[in-house]
């Protein structure tokens, strides 16, 4: 028998810890949970936090781009306008058909995965629930925790309400109000509300632009969404390189990948 490499050991351990969680949700109890210590669970939790922030969150080069399609649809629902683009990751055929993409409903419900919710939060610039996490040591005082942001049955709710003739929007994450602030183009308020006009304008000005969607389409990513090389015909100017190096939501090793590819 050959000894398992550390990477393989971590993979098996992670799957078994995950089985503990899934079986507990399904059956109410799991014997797999007895195999692990409190430290094991804490490390597993941090590994998930790091994965979600570096692949789908603000530490990811493509985090905002991955959530852009839904946010564009959300923006058109808020404005009650048919989808006209710019087209990114949406289903254009369905979104152009008001039967499948109505804009006059009092309530909308979308169902998706935890990773998609995280990319949506990133595109919406919800830095209130984000962190710059270390890949070398566990930060026990971090504010971002996957188990709190996108747990089983996570819910992200947007409420539009009329207060004294002015429309406001409020965000609730898993039943807790997340106060909107300057990261969403809003004036800070004790009740967490934001004027709808200000919120819409900020999305119009920043969601597509800040995602770097067109720019990222010239790059090739690996399974972890790390930039590895340019697509055939892709060109990066010096200005592009400078812009990417200043990106607040990139991996710190990305520039090395790109320069090596060029």
Task: Show which residues each predicted segment covers.
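A generic hydrophobic-helix recognition signal that picks specific residues
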Residues: 2, 106-108
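Long, low-complexity, polar/charged, intrinsically disordered or flexibly structured peripheral segments
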Residues: 13-36, 40
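Short beta-strand scaffold positions
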Residues: 111-112
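Single conserved hydrophobic/aromatic residue that forms the stacking wall/gate
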Residues: 1-8, 12
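Active-site-adjacent bridging/hinge elements
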Residues: 31-52, 82, 86-90
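Short, hydrophobic/proline-enriched secondary-structure or compact coil segments at domain edges
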Residues: 5-6, 16-21, 170-171
């Amino acid at each position: 028998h050959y000894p398992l490499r550390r990477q393989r050991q971590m993979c098996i351990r992670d799957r078994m810890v995950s089985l503990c969680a899934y079986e507990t949700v399904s059956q109410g109890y799991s014997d797999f949970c007895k195999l692990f210590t409190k430290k094991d669970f804490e490390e597993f939790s941090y590994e998930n936090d790091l994965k979600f922030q570096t692949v789908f969150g603000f530490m990811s080069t493509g985090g905002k781009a991955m959530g852009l399609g839904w946010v564009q649809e959300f923006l058109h629902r808020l404005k009650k306008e048919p989808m006209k683009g710019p087209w990114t990751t949406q289903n254009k055929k369905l979104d152009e058909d008001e039967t499948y993409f109505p804009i006059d409903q009092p309530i909308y419900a979308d169902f998706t995965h935890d990773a998609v919710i995280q990319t949506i939060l990133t595109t919406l610039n919800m830095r209130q629930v984000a962190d710059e996490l270390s890949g070398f040591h566990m930060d026990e005082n971090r504010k971002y925790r996957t188990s709190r942001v996108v747990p089983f049955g996570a819910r992200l709710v947007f409420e539009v309400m009329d207060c004294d003739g002015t429309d406001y929007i409020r965000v609730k994450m898993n039943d807790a109000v997340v106060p909107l602030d300057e990261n969403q183009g809003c004036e800070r308020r004790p009740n967490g509300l934001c004027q709808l006009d200000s919120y819409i304008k900020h999305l119009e000005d920043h969601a597509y632009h800040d995602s770097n969607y067109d720019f990222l389409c010239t790059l090739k990513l690996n399974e972890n969404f790390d930039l590895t090389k340019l697509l055939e015909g892709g060109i990066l100017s010096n200005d592009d390189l400078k812009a990417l190096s200043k990106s607040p939501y990139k991996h710190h090793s990305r520039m090395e990948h790109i320069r090596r590819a060029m």
